[in-house]
Amino acid sequence: MENELDELFARLRVATTPAEIEALQDGIWQLWLATGDQLLDKYLEAGIRALAAGDYTHAITEFTHLIEARPSFAEGWNKRATAYYLRGEYRASLLDVAETLRLEPRHFGALSGWATMLRMLGDQRGSLHVLRRLARLCPHLPGLANQLRDLEDELEG
């Protein structure tokens, strides 16, 4: 799986069209979501369903079971970070984002969420730093150049 991820990320760095970027990101997400274990799939799927239904407490419970069963599964941490964020628990979300990125430093979903939270919390410089890190992974991500320019203008102005 790691070689496949490396290949997809190498292609993502040079992808220029939105359709190509989306297809590569979808391929990466598929690999990130693969647990290879029925019980872990059950936790993951139940958590995703709870997220979609707006039941963030239940989602956090399911993702916590997943994390306890396999702490090395980065997507469990990322999904729980999302649930914490949606529940307004930004500190807990940021801690899970940090663990996601420790396990998978290229996690563009976690980077994007981190940048959003930092900006929302008033840390424009931190958000800019994270967005620049994201730009190294996917320089042509739709909307990213505008976000970077807006933040740079805001910080200079």
Stretches with model-predicted labels:
Residues 3, 23, 30, 129, ...:
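Terminal, low-structured helical/coil segments at or just beyond the last alpha-helical repeat
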Residues 52, 86, 120-121, 153-154:
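Register position in tetratricopeptide repeats
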Residues 19-22, 57, 91, 125:
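Residue register within tetratricopeptide repeats
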Residues 9, 26-29, 64, 98, ...:
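Alpha-solenoid helical repeat scaffolds
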